[in-house]
Amino acid sequence: MGDPGSEIIESVPPAGPEASESTTDENEDDIQFVSEGPLRPVLEYIDLVSSDDEEPSTSYTDENIKRKDHIDYQKDKVALTLARLARHVEVEKQQKEEKNRAFREKIDFQHAHGLQELEFIRGHSDTEAARLCVDQWLKMPGLKTGTINCGTKSSFRRGGHTWVSGKPILCPIMHCNKEFDNGHLLLGHLKRFDHSPCDPTITLHGPFFSSFACVVCYKKFVTQQQYRDHLFDKEATDDGHNNNLLPQIIQCFACPNCFLLFSRKEECSKHMSGKNHFHQSFKLGDNKGIAHPISFPSFAKKLLISLCKDVPFQVKCVACHKTLRSHMELTAHFRVHCRNAGPVAVAEKSITQVAEKFILRGYCPDCNQVFVDETSTQNHKQNSGHKVRVINSVEESVLLYCHSSEGNKDPSSDLHLLLDQSKFSSLKRTMSIKESSSLECIAIPKKKMNLKDKSHEGVACVQKEKSVVKTWFCECNQRFPSEDAVEKHVFSANTMGYKCVVCGKVCDDSGVIRLHMSRIHGGAHLNNFLFWCRTCKKELTRKDTIMAHVTEFHNGHRYFYEMDEVEGETLPSSSTTLDNLTANKPSSAITVIDHSPANSSPRGKWQCRICEDMFDSQEYVKQHCMSLASHKFHRYSCAHCRKPFHKIETLYRHCQDEHDNEIKIKYFCGLCDLIFNVEEAFLSHYEEHHSIDYVFVSEKTETSIKTEDDFPVIETSNQLTCGCRESYICKVNRKEDYSRCLQIMLDKGKLWFRCSLCSATAQNLTDMNTHIHQVHKEKSDEEEQQYVIKCGTCTKAFHDPESAQQHFHRKHCFLQKPSVAHFGSEKSNLYKFTASASHTERKLKQAINYSKSLDMEKGVENDLSYQNIEEEIVELPDLDYLRTMTHIVFVDFDNWSNFFGHLPGHLNQGTFIWGFQGGNTNWKPPLNCKIYNYLNRIGCFFLHPRCSKRKDAADFAICMHAGRLDEQLPKQIPFTILSGDQGFLELENQFKKTQRPAHILNPHHLEGDMMCALLNSISDTTKECDSDDNMGAKNTSIGEEFISTEDVELEEAIRRSLEEM
């Protein structure tokens, strides 16, 4: 082998101008070593340089020869990367310019479209323009076809888009017939509970296209100019056309059979062909042809809609015919009672019956009068000699009715007064007025004069003057400046009020009860309240029945009447009376007062209408009502959660504990449920409305046929939530309240009758006796009772209604104003499952309970407090009832006392809450908590009797009852335990061995929203969790993978639940 140095030198490519280009394109892989020699130091042949700026060279080559090393290659890579980045930036710039250009084009298109729409709707009214804009907005497509964009607030809607069906959704209430584009609109409609079948606007969609109709020849014109040209052409003819003739604006069309309104004539024709409504409901004249859509003027449309809104309706169950007054009550009824039935809406009148108001028989053009029958038409023709036009079609009748009502200058024909005719007060009486031609005097009833001398039977007269004012008088001779004031006086004097059907709140003013319905119940059918008589404790469904009730049961303020008086004059004095009236009659006038009696000053006392305390003088009652300290009610409200408080210190502590020391105060009026931002507004409200809320109660001096026993005794004890009182002074009042309360409990399903021989139930004793006589005639024994009365909340059975009612009062009723002593500690009780016992054991146990209840009644007199009972056998919830649930939740109130306060919304239907308490904890039911009240009312909440005073007593009770329920309930029902103790994790493992889906939630690590979402998601994914548990039981070797899979599915279920919220 030769010298390796020469071989290495030969392997280096020659340097020179020809080789520079080829050297630049070469890679490191092109260098080849042709031979290997003995290892020698490379430093002998290569000069090493310490600086990166100098080029390395060999000892035997020219200075012009250069080779590329690692640094050159890195520089080439950097140059290529920079070039690639520059091209990428250029492409992004071009794309951004294209996007900006497309956005500018879109903005220009929307601007042009808006100008076009403005030009199109310029000839329409403001209402039509707004309706048209809303209609166009609803038709605009979203970001995707058939989807709704979630928007920026995607924390609860991370699933992307919500699918919307193109087909309208029909309201599930029969005869409601309202359709909605999506489920959100349907849900709002169901909560408002506006299912009136008498609604002509359910088919009134889209914008109105107005036309103008002539009431003489019934021709229609598209524009007003065409109508004016028509009047100008017909002015010469003597047929009623003149330049001052106003047109009727046609905005919609009505079906001649059902009188539903449509925006377009084509839609009405399509409806008539689909429903076969080609025959008319009202036949006028000899017109027997095919019916056509009726042109409906704007005046008739507004009047028909207003009259239909005043038609009362009810939603009933088709099976039991029970009246359902709210969406919550409807849902609970069909989930608990009539599962296979449905609701139906029934109205007192149909749309056709309301539209009969527009049907006329004749019209007089000379005096602009309409006639509803042929008799009045003929009488007018004979008396006046006018030519009366006979109406031959429904369309002519509607047009002439609107023309006569709008053209008549009489105020009584105005639309508002036409609507007020249906709202005429039933307490008003019409007094006859006789005029004397000689003196032009007005007869005044003698009771109005308030004369002391009753020996004169003549009629007093006052000289008529030009200026006459209307005055309203009550039967008690008080004078009022307006009809509203006297009607309010009659209502207050007869203790009439307004009662909310949903929550039972009673108000004295109709405006306050409507505001209460709107704010508290979300506007759920604003008329969902009744008239309530405090004296008789009677509900009146309609205002028309008030007159009959007041006349029959009340006295002194049964009606009011209207009289015309000379302005500036008082009642008849000695100078204005007739000769048969002596000068000793009073000359003073009856002043207009609301809170004081007449000038005769009868004996009596002043009563505060808030607390019903009596006072001897008006000054005392005024000072009492003016003082805020006289009445105890909520005055402050938390601006975060709207929870009311009595004291501001309590509100401060609440904000520090619940809202991270962020104090926001609002002022709350607990008397009428109004909220104010500043204290001055609250004080002004109290001074204007509640500081004068007192009335004078006169003492009856005349002889009465009633005895002392007939006068009611005022009970002063605390009132329960069912309407009864905690204790009674008078046995008559106790008997009346108990009988009324028992009937209400049976009607509302809080108590019911159940057959002992089968599972049949009934709401009254008559139906149960009929069932036993017809079905169990052979088995029935006359000496033995064949039925029991069951509690609707805990399903405990009793042998008589009185024992069941006492049980309900003792266990499921609370004080309306609870005291601390009411929720005192109880002694330990005995618990026993009785749902799965045999029929004989149940009878034996019921007999024992019945005998015990009789012994209790003998020891307690006129009191519902049974705190002295040393031992009581408490029945746990019925297992048959628990099998219908979809989720059982065990709550440890020792660790989570404010469980219901943390819930942001309602839990899913089928969730049963079982609460436990022990140790030194004394859990109290939350006040004014809608979620707790709803669960307690439908029987989905059970408060376990107090455990022992041990710290972990509630934990042991939860483990014991959860284990018992695990043996007897279906495995697909999940169990959830809400407690902060780590020992329950072992219970979860034990449940997995029995294939029971169970979850242990720590209240200290969860917020209210997350906790509510977890509970709802567990209820929704019952089957999925059950299948996962079955797989885990079969494959015990992959337990860790199962846990991770279950957590992922649980998070997915939580996400879906949050999307639904």
Curated annotation (Swiss-Prot):
Q: What is the effect of changing R40A?
A: Reduces E3 SUMO-protein ligase activity by 96% (in vitro)
Q: Where is this cross-link: Glycyl lysine isopeptide (Lys-Gly) (interchain with G-Cter in SUMO1)?
A: K706
Phosphoserine: residues carrying this PTM: S155, S432
Question: Which stretches does the entry tag as region Interaction with SUMO2 1?
Answer: 30-37
Where is this protein chiefly located? nucleus
Q: Where is this region: Important for interaction with SUMO1 and SUMO2?
A: 1-344
**InterPro entries, sorted:** PIN_11, Znf_C2H2_type
Indicate where the modification Omega-N-methylarginine is found in the sequence.
R158
Q: Zinc finger (C2H2-type) residue ranges?
A: 169-195, 253-277, 315-337, 362-386, 498-521, 531-554, 606-631, 636-659, 667-690, 753-776, 789-812
Q: Where is this region: Sufficient for E3 SUMO-protein ligase activity?
A: 1-246
GO CC, sorted alphabetically, is: nucleus; PML body
Report the function annotation for this chain. Answer: E3 SUMO-protein ligase; has a preference for SUMO2 and SUMO3 and facilitates UBE2I/UBC9-mediated sumoylation of target proteins. Plays a role in protein SUMO2 modification in response to stress caused by DNA damage and by proteasome inhibitors (in vitro). Required for MCM4 sumoylation. Has no activity with SUMO1. Preferentially transfers an additional SUMO2 chain onto the SUMO2 consensus site 'Lys-11'. Negatively regulates transcriptional activation mediated by the SMAD4 complex in response to TGF-beta signaling. Inhibits EP300-mediated acetylation of histone H3 at 'Lys-9'.
Protein name per UniProt? E3 SUMO-protein ligase ZNF451
Q: Which organism is it from?
A: Homo sapiens
